[in-house]
């Protein structure tokens, strides 16, 4: 039985972010739909060929998406919200973009669909909307067209489909409440149709993704898998695909299904290979996810070989990435600035394909010399001086309970803060960043390339900060921000100023739609060699009598949005970051900054996928935030910001952060997230986001007032702040001014209505 290689998916955006540039050009009206489609075809062809050349035997098809693969599945099933539909009922790429971002070059703008985190990753998906009595039909044939493309190029392929049960699990009911699982019988005929079309094309295997099978699902959802897969069986071979956790707790459900193979994530799960082999039906193929699809570290292939070799020859076996390589940068070979030693520790998507090929060849032949050679650098790293800092380890060991306690409880602090700031009712603010204009990006790029000296760079940044303050004062905002002109990314910026991180030139990964991020890599112990944000915050505060917030990214978010070390726990990394940023809080306070925002949008996304594992994570995650913040005096107001969150099940931990003010994303969910705070009787102040910054649509004054009145039905008005959902970095100035002007006007109207 020859072992084969495959990946669960490949990055979509292109090495130079070609897809992002094509999308944004099309959205801006600067290029045609045909030009956009051509870029997609070119990228798919390139990526298939690159994977093939790197040693992948079965290429994934259907992993490409114009915005998000869950949204692609919604269109496949004809699940288009009424507000986004074309007048003639047709579905096209602009339909997709209207759902994802609220507008497109054609059609009427409408509120974008909700967006949330894809399991516990930093990728976002567009949440499917379901209504009672909804009908489904095959309306979007992108998958079939891409299969035809790949077959025409002569590739051996494995189409990828998001499975029906997980698709329903990921969605939300809109309108009259009902059990969305009852729609399963209605979507299965579309899946049957698609599988029949794939069978007609000679497809042998289909990867059908059911990552919900790693969760602690309600019994009714577990019971739904058997009838669903009974309906789908028989047309092609199905590789039931799971990732991000192990499957052992749900293995009884899985082995009863009429599928021909199972993919398991052997990186993030705790499944035992021998037990899986023993319990799976003898004729099933096992796809072993041995190469980490979510990190950038070179694998110790000698360990991987030892992990799987015992079952070689005993059942059909493939070796694969743990999950889609969507979460990894594309190609390490173009990184020319990385230190040679550090570069030898890494592997990006194409190198991970090569790792799979090396592992396949060794498992098929029994020859391991190539694995030992490949693994030598990562083994040598364990003893590198770049990794360990005795002073950091000593400080971490000395943390006491007192380090995470503010001097007094919120009620006492709030009095001191009211006396200091004297803010009006319904105080207005923004979340931190202002539009990153072409001029700002060009300034940073010229400085980075050495085309601009430090003095001229600083003069330019100072001018943009000054303009941001002027804009906010004109708008009448109450608490200002400096606008973050000097920051490329909220995590990358801090990583650049902390020891223990390294950065790539082209290590882009998709976050959502056209948004890409370049996560820093944690390679060693973390410390702060010098103040990071103090100079610009102090300068901004000197320009105005209104309070200017100091802006920090919190320790858990920096951890979650970086590629972490694999040789220490996530708790250790988070607390090292917290100690470094604790010093930053103290320095900001000493510089006269009275309001300091510590963003933790990733706190919830970092949750383990199984609830039984949550408590331990939340305990150290909350402690890390408090270590970061607790150095502040009573009169210093600590804000935190969170987005894409369901808060119901972690309200105890949100309250335990003990932030004086929390700002949250609520506009896309029509303030329903505030139910959690109301039910919990959350004691501190809250700023529910009143408009969606991910959409270019400008909210009306009436819309914002209505949302705020809805918020005031749940939270006492004296504890409410008024702010957008998130930072304004990706928006343009005209829409930013218009939206903020309406927001300020709505707040003024509510003050006068008292």
Curated annotation (Swiss-Prot):
The residues listed in the UniProt record as binding L-methionine, with positions renumbered to this chain, are: 431-433, 484, 599
Enzyme Commission code(s) on record? 2.1.1.14
Q: Which cofactor does it need?
A: Zn(2+)
Read off the lineage from the record.
Bacteria, Pseudomonadati, Pseudomonadota, Gammaproteobacteria, Enterobacterales
What this protein is called in its record is 5-methyltetrahydropteroyltriglutamate--homocysteine methyltransferase
Name the job this protein performs. Catalyzes the transfer of a methyl group from 5-methyltetrahydrofolate to homocysteine resulting in methionine formation.
Q: In which pathway does it act?
A: Amino-acid biosynthesis; L-methionine biosynthesis via de novo pathway; L-methionine from L-homocysteine (MetE route): step 1/1
Q: Where along the chain is L-homocysteine bound? A: 431-433, 484, 599
The UniProt family comment states: Belongs to the vitamin-B12 independent methionine synthase family.
Q: Binding positions for Zn(2+)? A: 641, 643, 665, 726
Record key words, sorted = Amino-acid biosynthesis, Metal-binding, Methionine biosynthesis, Methyltransferase, Repeat, Transferase, Zinc
Known catalysed reaction(s)? 5-methyltetrahydropteroyltri-L-glutamate + L-homocysteine = tetrahydropteroyltri-L-glutamate + L-methionine
The active site lies at 694 (proton donor)
- List ligand-binding residues for 5-methyltetrahydropteroyltri-L-glutamate: 17-20, 117, 515-516, 561, 605
Q: Which InterPro entries match?
A: Cbl-indep_Met_Synth_N (IPR013215), Cobalamin-indep_Met_synthase (IPR006276), Met_Synth_C/arc (IPR002629), UROD/MetE-like_sf (IPR038071)
Q: What is a single molecular function from GO for this protein?
A: 5-methyltetrahydropteroyltriglutamate-homocysteine S-methyltransferase activity
The note on the cofactor says: Binds 1 zinc ion per subunit.
Pfam families per the UniProt record, alphabetical: Meth_synt_1 (PF08267), Meth_synt_2 (PF01717)
GO biological process, alphabetically ordered: methionine biosynthetic process; methylation
